[in-house]
């Protein structure tokens, strides 16, 4: 008996252990097997007794009792009758919980089509039957008959007949000579009659025969679905339903409200409609009603079932009493409020609270201040148990009373409970994993949570009213994880870039900066001190100042651990700072013996972390914080309006620029330049002026003044704040005291008239009006882009969520090549910074001696990187996530260093999610940061390259001409200038623009900062290569060229117009030719005539008969006027790259190396072909829309991958032409460019992880002897498995090409249908999965969260491993026992196996 009572409290139903979940279409038999009874009446509950009606939607006989262990009529109550069925009300006596589990069903009087398989595109029923959706609907909704069996009549199989045609055919051929049906029964018969095997063979044969691409695609689609039905065991006729399942009543509750009204789930309404119509149809059939009435009723039944499954997918939306659309079963799953995202992936949490945060500068880094009231509530159960253990209360009720009265002993116990019990703090929005961290609570008075100032950067928190949530980890495992993995002291480095994120900011920085200033000529300069105590004494007695230059004997540690001393010239303040430095040989006093800006402090923290470890770093950070706050308070820095110094030369610069602008205006009036060029030049001049004034202002503010006594005065406090990195930026200072500069219109164009005043002088009304544009745009952008960025993060997380470190080494020899990124002649990302923390893919050798510096397979630390850079290595091949050959996840060697820990990455690390967060988080940060500069225009147009090394110039593909002005001009498109140092190592290479003026030539020596070449960034020239006289071809006034008079100037300039639009000039080919003395067109060296084709909008620079020399400009094409670039261009750009969208006017890329030839024009396109250098290849032809500027001439030589037409290349083209490595390099660089503009650091490996996920699919080009269909996209893994199988069987394997998918598409095509369904397009994903009978292997994170298991990452990964080992061991034991049993037949029965514990 006792045993039975015990069983009551822990029910014996074991948690199900499963490894995979399969989804398929439910057959009518299956639905009946789930059901506990048929629902015959639409009634729900009796409004007087509130008891469910029998056979109704809430029937207790079918679904179970309403109260635990009590039948409906009350005859049997309590436990002892468990399992008895009451004879009066037929209700089983059991737990009421079964009302959440038991299903019912409705027997339909006529079959109906399942709307998902009918309407969800592509229509599965339509594909199988090869009928259009329109025809299907006509049959289903009783408009047309379909011929099933034409017999000997002239009718065709599956011919549609209208009512009249049907009757006519019956009259003509007789009633039994053919079979035609209408409605879902007809479709069901058609589906049942399909012979899938025959159909598959037929389709394969058709595919082999057809030449048409469209037909091939259609057959492939049908073949795919036929195979899906064959392989999954689903029967096509199951897509037509004869039984509708009814979900358990507690999942669609009906709750009585006061006042006799009821709140009900919409599903009840939808089920009621179905039951009503079904019953009516049954009655009509029994009454033998006329066909037309029955048909109408059947149609209405079909509509009712449609609405139940997916309301609004077909016809009008069914609305409830209050005109609100009813939520159907599909809506329950879909969207943010659907089951997946609302309840499975995001759950509400108990044991949590939230409050406003305030700063807690006296806390240690691992602490947070928790209000007593909050702690008392959150830790209640712990307090109760402790009170009980101490004998202070005997019952829970008593304990509750004690706690409610807040007795003194309760506070003591709360202290005990809280000690060493971490809590989690979270600030929304949680953009990356540092948005939730664990702290040890300390109890405080008041009602606000206290937060340590140094973790604010990680949470992106400030104290202007932000709120934070507190969560309590309950189980011991959870507390352990919180302490070991999530404690704030364990998260010192940023997972996105490996830099410290626990970095002082604002006041702390200002205090440390003030502390480290050194000023000449203060009292006590040059005194010598040996101990800190002496310095303190001197400071106290005002013998020296904090900033006085003194000499100091520093006591440090040598490499061997013995104490060493050294003399330094420093200041008292810096010595105070030196006292908090850890004692370590690698961290000398020099580390802080300089002016400490924010960046310097960050560097010191990084050094301390690398050399002294985490504990020391945390202590150092806390000390440095206290020191900073204290000194900021001691310094008492403030500023007034006179601290904003307007530079003296401001008005001179403004007047000069004004006169320049006037000059440009004049040039425009004289017709020398176009409107666009004038605009560009004016904008350029004003932005240069703004820069100049800003520089002068900075010079003046930062200059050190002398006081009357001859010593240095205090530095300007605004400059201190900006220079230290505490607050403000040079851009803001420029607006305060320089000149506000150019403003942008909301469209992104720049207004030509700048704002000359600054905020100190005040703006005029017009200036103020102009500046409102920028401010308004900034605020609007912020709101929009926060949402966009959040969505980008969601897509990234979704595509990468199953990327986990699953092995230590995949053993691949592949890798990608890394070199420094150089932009406009400056190194923006050094080689060292790009390879740090990555694994070398091959031995790295010193170029001069060929000695191995770093052997392959080494994880590169700082020391290795230094050695590589010292040796002058230009290119390093490293392992990458892109080339990792692991089937599931990524291996640790290919990933490299875990950036947040600075150590090799651990097994089970969810690198995909970290990558997604690292890329998404700054997106939101940046989007919120656009309007800080008030829309002040910042233009960056590159117009020169300069050397950043000393060395010698060598030129590859040299082509330089001297034009009639005597200037050297670059005449070829692929000229590369390389700078070689004294050892002959190539330090850097620059590609020179066509038409650039060269400042150096082959063999010149060059100094750092010297210009190599210059060009006009706003125009593209067309140059002549020969000397001679100009002639025009097909340049006909009014047809292909027009003298446009500029209205405002009255000056004519000649512009090529679109000659095809003028009707008469369709066959013209406008060109400029260069003729010799004999009047014939000259020949070029490379072959072909000196004929230069012109494109639309080219502006002529020469006239007929003028003499030209090589390098002279014949015509120029103006490029677009400058637009401002801020992350607005940025975020959509990043999304565009990750979505792999084709850019609007994509570049056209040469698919092969060869010679350009112009062919005959085609309608309104120009035809260009490439004659390949490799004669075995076919020539390639490109049609280029008119108006696109082709900057190549007939006979130019191009390399594979060169641009024929400028623009942004489509990533798919790069993949097809240049391969995966080039594509990855392109995507990484483009995405990094956007973030770099904003000064955001993201490690390349994060972007590589996402790109890897975008390259998971292969398009089958030739199916070989495999089951795959050519033209279909399959998973890489699947593709390889199929090919391995084919090779084993000696068949011909398939070939395929990698396909690049955008992140949304890639997410929807993952192997897990759970993950895809919870992302987007739920209906479509589930329909497809059901038809295919897909199995979800539950490998990713999302799927496991959805089914409620531990995720296979982090600590969950080790659990999964243990489980795997246990399973294997059990299998071995079982096999052993079976062997034994086979040998000894009469052995006693084996005891039951020890199964691994269920999760």
Swiss-Prot record:
GO biological process: DNA-templated transcription
Record keywords: DNA-directed RNA polymerase, Magnesium, Metal-binding, Nucleotidyltransferase, Transcription, Transferase, Zinc
Documented EC number(s): 2.7.7.6
Superkingdom of the source species: Bacteria
Keyword hit for Amino-acid biosynthesis: no
Stretch list, region Disordered: 1376-1399
SUPFAM superfamilies recorded: beta and beta-prime subunits of DNA dependent RNA-polymerase
Free-text comment on the cofactor: Binds 1 Mg(2+) ion per subunit. Binds 2 Zn(2+) ions per subunit.
List of residues binding Zn(2+) 1: 71, 73, 86, 89
Keyword tRNA processing: no
Function: DNA-dependent RNA polymerase catalyzes the transcription of DNA into RNA using the four ribonucleoside triphosphates as substrates.
Family: Belongs to the RNA polymerase beta' chain family.
Database matches in NCBIfam families: rpoC_TIGR
Name of this chain's protein: DNA-directed RNA polymerase subunit beta'
Organism: Afipia carboxidovorans (strain ATCC 49405 / DSM 1227 / KCTC 32145 / OM5) (Oligotropha carboxidovorans)
């Amino acid at each position: 008996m006792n045993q039975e009572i015990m069983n009551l409290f822990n029910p014996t139903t074991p948690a199900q252990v499963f490894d995979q979940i399969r989804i398929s279409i439910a057959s009518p038999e299956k639905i009946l097997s789930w059901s506990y009874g048929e629902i015959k009446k639409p009634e729900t509950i009796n409004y007087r007794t509130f008891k469910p009606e029998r056979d109704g939607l809430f029937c207790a006989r079918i679904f179970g009792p309403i109260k635990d262990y009590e039948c409906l009529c009350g005859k049997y109550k309590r436990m002892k009758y468990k399992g008895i069925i009451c004879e009066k009300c037929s209700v089983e006596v059991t737990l009421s919980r079964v009302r959440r589990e038991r299903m019912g069903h409705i027997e339909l009087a006529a079959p109906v089509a399942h709307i998902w398989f009918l309407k969800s595109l592509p229509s599965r029923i339509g594909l199988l039957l090869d009928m259009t959706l329109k025809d299907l609907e006509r049959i289903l909704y009783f408009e047309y008959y379909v011929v099933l069996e034409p017999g000997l009549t002239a009718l065709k199989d599956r011919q549609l007949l209208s009512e009249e045609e049907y009757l006519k055919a019956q009259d003509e051929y007789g009633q039994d000579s053919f079979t035609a049906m209408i409605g879902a029964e007809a479709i069901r018969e058609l589906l049942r009659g399909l012979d899938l095997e025959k159909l598959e063979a037929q389709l394969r044969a058709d595919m082999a025969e057809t030449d048409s691409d469209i037909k091939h695609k259609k057959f492939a689609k049908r073949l795919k679905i036929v195979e899906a039905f064959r392989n999954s065991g689903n029967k096509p006729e199951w897509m037509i339903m004869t039984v509708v399942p009814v979900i358990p009543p507690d999942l669609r509750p009906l709750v009585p409200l006061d006042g006799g009204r009821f709140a009900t789930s919409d599903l009840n309404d939808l089920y009621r409609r179905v039951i009503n119509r079904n019953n009516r149809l049954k009655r009509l059939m029994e009454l033998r009603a006329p066909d037309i009435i029955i048909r109408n009723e059947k149609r209405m039944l079909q509509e009712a079932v449609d609405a139940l499954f997916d309301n609004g997918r077909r016809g009008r939306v069914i609305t409830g009493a209050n005109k609100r659309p009813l939520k159907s079963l599909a809506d329950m799953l879909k969207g943010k409020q659907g089951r997946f995202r609302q309840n499975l992936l995001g759950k509400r949490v108990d044991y949590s609270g939230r409050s406003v945060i305030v700063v807690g500068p006296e806390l240690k880094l691992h602490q947070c201040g928790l209000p007593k009231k909050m702690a008392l509530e959150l830790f209640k159960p712990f307090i109760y148990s402790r009170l009980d253990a101490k004998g202070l209360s005997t019952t829970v009720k008593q304990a509750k009373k004690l706690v409610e009265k807040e007795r003194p002993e309760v506070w003591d116990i709360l202290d005990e409970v809280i000690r060493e019990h971490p809590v989690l703090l979270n600030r929304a929005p949680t953009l990356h994993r540092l948005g939730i961290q664990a702290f040890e609570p300390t109890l405080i008075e008041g009602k606000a949570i206290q937060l340590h100032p140094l973790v604010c950067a990680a949470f992106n928190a400030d104290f202007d009213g932000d709120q934070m949530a507190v969560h309590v980890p309950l189980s011991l495992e959870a507390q352990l994880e919180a302490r070991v993995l999530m404690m704030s002291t364990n998260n010192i480095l940023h997972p996105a870039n490996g830099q410290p994120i626990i970095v002082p900011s604002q006041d702390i920085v200002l205090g440390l900066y003030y502390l480290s200033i050194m000023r000449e000529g203060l009292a006590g300069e040059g005194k010598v001190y040996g101990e800190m105590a002496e310095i303190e004494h001197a400071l106290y007695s005002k013998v020296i100042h904090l900033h006085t230059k003194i000499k100091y004997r520093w006591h440090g540690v040598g490499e061997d651990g013995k104490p060493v001393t050294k003399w330094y010239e420093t200041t008292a303040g810096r010595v105070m700072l030196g006292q908090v430095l850890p004692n370590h040989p690698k961290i000398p006093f020099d580390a802080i013996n300089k002016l400490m800006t924010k960046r310097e402090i960050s560097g010191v923290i990084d050094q301390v972390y690398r050399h002294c470890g985490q504990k020391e770093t945390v202590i150092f950070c806390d000390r440095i914080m206290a020191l900073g706050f204290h000194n900021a308070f001691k310094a008492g820095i403030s500023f007034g309006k006179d601290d904003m110094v307007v530079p003296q030369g401001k008005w001179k610069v403004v007047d000069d620029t004004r006169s320049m602008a006037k000059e440009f205006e004049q040039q425009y009036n004289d017709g020398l330049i176009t409107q666009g060029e004038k605009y560009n030049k004016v904008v350029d001049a004003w932005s240069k002026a703004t820069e100049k004034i800003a520089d002068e202002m900075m010079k003046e503010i930062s200059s050190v003044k002398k006081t009357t006594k001859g010593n240095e005065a205090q530095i300007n406090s605004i400059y201190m704040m900006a220079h230290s990195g505490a607050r403000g930026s040079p851009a803001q200072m420029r607006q305060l005291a320089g000149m506000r500069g150019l403003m942008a219109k909301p469209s992104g164009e720049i207004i030509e008239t700048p704002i000359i005043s600054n905020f100190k002088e005040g703006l005029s009304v017009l200036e103020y009006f102009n500046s409102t544009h920028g401010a308004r745009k900034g605020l609007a952008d912020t709101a929009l882009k926060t949402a966009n960025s959040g969505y980008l993060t969601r897509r990234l997380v979704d595509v990468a969520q199953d990327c986990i470190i699953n092995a230590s080494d995949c053993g691949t020899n592949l890798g990608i090549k890394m070199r420094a990124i150089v932009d406009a002649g400056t190194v923006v990302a050094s080689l060292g910074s790009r390879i740090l923390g990555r694994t070398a893919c091959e031995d790295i050798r010193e170029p001069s001696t060929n000695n191995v510096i770093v052997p392959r397979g080494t994880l590169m630390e700082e020391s290795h990187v230094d050695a590589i850079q010292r040796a002058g290595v230009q290119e390093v091949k490293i392992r990458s996530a892109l080339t990792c050959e692991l089937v599931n996840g990524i291996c640790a060697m290919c990933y490299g260093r875990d950036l947040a820990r600075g150590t090799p990455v651990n097994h089970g690390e969810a690198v995909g999610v970290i990558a997604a967060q690292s890329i998404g988080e700054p997106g939101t940060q940046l989007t919120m940061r656009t309007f800080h500069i008030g829309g002040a225009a910042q233009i960056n147009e590159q117009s020169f390259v300069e050397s950043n090394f000393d060395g010698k110039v060598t030129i590859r593909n040299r082509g330089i001409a001297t034009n009639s002005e005597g200037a050297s001009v670059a005449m070829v498109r692929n000229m590369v200038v390389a700078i070689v140092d004294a050892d002959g190592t190539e330090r850097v290479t620059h590609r020179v623009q066509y038409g650039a003026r060269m400042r150096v030539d082959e063999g010149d020596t060059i100094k750092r900062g010297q210009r190599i070449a210059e060009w006009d960034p706003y125009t593209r020239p067309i140059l002549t290569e020969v000397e001679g006289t100009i002639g025009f071809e097909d340049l006909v006034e009014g047809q292909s060229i027009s003298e446009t008079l500029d209205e405002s100037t009255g000056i004519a300039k000649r512009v090529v117009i679109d000659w095809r639009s003028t009707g008469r000039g369709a066959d013209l080919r406008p060109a400029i030719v260069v003729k010799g003395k004999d009047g014939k067109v000259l020949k070029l060296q490379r072959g072909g005539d000196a004929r230069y084709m012109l494109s639309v909008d080219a502006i002529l620079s020469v006239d007929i008969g003028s003499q030209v020399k090589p390098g002279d400009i014949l015509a120029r094409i103006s490029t677009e006027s400058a637009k401002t670039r801020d992350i607005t261009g940025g975020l959509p750009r990043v999304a565009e790259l990750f979505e792999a969208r084709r850019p609007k006017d994509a570049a056209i890329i040469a698919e092969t190396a060869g010679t350009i030839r112009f062919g005959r024009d085609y309608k309104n396109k120009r035809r260009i072909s490439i004659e390949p250098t490799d004669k075995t290849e076919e020539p390639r032809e490109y049609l280029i829309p008119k108006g696109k500027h082709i900057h190549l001439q007939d006979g130019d030589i191009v390399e594979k991958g060169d641009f024929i037409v400028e623009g942004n290349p489509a990533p798919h083209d790069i993949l097809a032409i240049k391969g995966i490595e080039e594509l990855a390099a392109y995507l990484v660089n483009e995405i990094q460019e956007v973030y770099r503009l904003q000064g955001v650091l993201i490690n390349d490996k994060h972007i590589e992880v996402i790109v890897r996920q975008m390259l998971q699919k292969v398009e089958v080009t030739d199916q070989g002897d495999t089951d795959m269909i050519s033209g279909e996209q399959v998973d890489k893994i699947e593709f390889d498995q199929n090919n391995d199988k084919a090779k084993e069987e000696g068949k011909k394997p398939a070939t395929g090409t990698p396909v690049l998918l955008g992140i949304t598409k890639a997410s929807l095509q993952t192997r897990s249908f759970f993950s895809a369904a919870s992302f987007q397009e739920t209906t479509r994903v589930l329909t497809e999965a059901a038809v295919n009978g897909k199995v979800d292997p539950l490998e990713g994170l999302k799927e496991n969260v959805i089914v409620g298991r531990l995720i296979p990452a982090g600590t969950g990964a080790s659990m999964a491993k243990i489980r795997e080992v246990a399973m294997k061991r059990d299998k071995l034991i079982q096999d052993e026992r079976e062997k034994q049993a086979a040998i000894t037949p009469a052995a006693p029965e084996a005891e039951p196996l020890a199964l691994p514990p269920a999760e």
